[in-house]
Amino acid sequence: MAKVKTSYVCSQCGYETSKWNGKCPNCGEWNTFEEVELAVRAGGAKSKPTTVRDISDKIVGIDDVDASYNEIRYATGLKELDRVLGGGLVKGSLVLLGGEPGIGKSTMLLQICQYLGQDHTILYVSGEESVRQIKLRANRLHVDSENLYLLADNDCEQICSVIVKEKPEIVIIDSIQTMNISGISSAQGSVTQVRECTNMFMRTAKSEEIPMFIVGHVNKDGAIAGPKVMEHIVDCVLYFEGQRNPVSYTHLTLPTKR
């Protein structure tokens, strides 16, 4: 039988402790700890010994590695975006697109779908809008592609299962703050949910070799809502910034890329 374990996680750096602290000992920020509850196994029964797998056969000499496959990139159709991505989307990469709500993140991603959908299958997953709302917005942007598929859901485990089964060539998650894992008791958008959902999407992207865009909203301080460790989980972080007064414009910045 599972029991509930309570811990505290820093919303800035992801540092976890069993007791609440006013100041995070890892990043030095004040009042950033949030209480989270996790279901853990009761310690009554002894666990079975784990069998260690022999992975020595996976060792490969560096001269024997075929690196040409990793050079395959999907051009997005947006010249500046392709430039900051080093030529386009890499297979198996996870790109975090952050920005204020309403700045145009979803609009830009639908425009990318219009271009990429000519030759590639795309799964657009929304936890914020219904498929009808996405369709109406796509109509306003004149986005029409028979290779674009829509899914309105926020269950991270179910979404990853669909990705593995259907095997789309490109996936868009809009947004990470609306996703959740049922086994975690904390609310959507919490430190634990955002971190673990990001980890799950990353594992799926790598195992299936599918590039993914995930949308992340920024908070009032201009940082992507959720733990800072999320930015270190993904392969690339893009900030979509803009100014409405006196002149309206938007631009992409690339603070992190690995």
Where on the chain are the PLM-derived regions?
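N-terminal, positively charged regions that mediate nucleic acid binding
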Residues: 21, 212, 237
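A short helix-turn-beta junction within AAA+ P-loop NTPase domains corresponding to the substrate/partner-engaging
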Residues: 229-239
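Detector for small/aliphatic-rich hydrophobic stretches
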Residues: 5, 16-95, 119-124
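Conserved inter-motif catalytic segment of the P-loop NTP-binding fold
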Residues: 92, 100-103, 110-200
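Structural recognition of the conserved hydrophobic beta-strand(s) that form the central parallel beta-sheet
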Residues: 172, 211-216
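Substrate-engagement module of ASCE P-loop NTPases
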Residues: 193-213
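Cys/His-rich Zn2+-binding cysteine-cluster or related metal-binding knuckle/ribbon modules and their
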Residues: 1-23, 28-37, 41, 176, ...
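Conserved small/polar residues in nucleotide/adenosyl-binding loops
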Residues: 250-256
